Amino acid sequence: MSWNTLHKPITVLAALLLGTISFTATGAAKWANPSLLVTPDTVKQNINKPNWVVVDCRDLKDYAKGHIPGAISLGKRCKKALRDTTARVWRDTSKYEKLFGKVGISNNTHVVFYYGDMKTLTDATVGFWIMEYLGHDKVHVLNGGLDAWRKAGNRLDNKPVKKAAATFKAKIKASRYAPTDEILSVARGKTVRQLIDSRTKKEYAGKDIRAIRGGHIPNTTVNVSHLDSLAKSINKKTGKMEAVAYLDPDAANKAFGKLDKSKRTIAFCQTGTRSTMTYMQLRLMGFKDPANWDESWRVYGSQLAFPVGGEQWYNFAGLNKKLKKLEKKVAKLEGKK
């Protein structure tokens, strides 16, 4: 049976299966590359095939409580298992070759990453982006994650799964990785790129500072928080409108539809994590040259020579006062012992 036969179009009904959501989609927008996403049915029909590996992107403890039967774990959340301690990709690609080969992934393997909820959605997209950066052309994400699997009436298993080792060789696709020098050139007006800031509005405005300085990259094209590029729904428990952990073409088109798909387009955030979701949306929409900026604001905002729009400095004096107050409270508590 062919891949096209197995892959079923993702409909609004599939989104409604996620449980506590209630929203209306027009269905006007369609993904240009829909096969990057898979449905529970596709996973169920293929998971036991030797050339398919399904990766649970949650913590090992969550995996042990219940996972898709046949799915493997990388031992920790994907965004930690696939990057170094500074949340950056390993530049030594042999580490990826060893890691993926050990869990049974070869260059001919269809790899499906899935998440548990909104918190781990970007773990799956981190995995997706890294594999595309490594040149793997058979990588997918289970849209709706574990919730979609459950709502489709499928069972979970708590038995650990280990695949036979395989050989994986990286074929780096450098264009998927945006270096800081490229962003700096855009900020200084020397290079033209479409920059998507996937941080929150407060981060963009410098009101939420997560580096030495807050603010934004000059010449940024658009600021769309990663949550704002998802469909919204009414949470029946809280009564509030919230983003749904489901990649929806209408929501993505609303966020990025006015951008030029033929131009190089780079997504970034604070650590290059949230922006991997934006990167995947760009791939789904058919952007010709999308990239993720791995170093993102955490590196840029701490480089004092780099230009910043709406620049705001971190209040170290205020932090020092808070620390002194805390020290006094601790001293009092210790004195009572």
Named regions from a protein language model:
Residues 2-13:
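Bacterial N-terminal signal peptides that target proteins for export
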Residues 26-53, 60-194, 198-337:
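Rhodanese-like catalytic fold shared by cysteine-dependent sulfurtransferases
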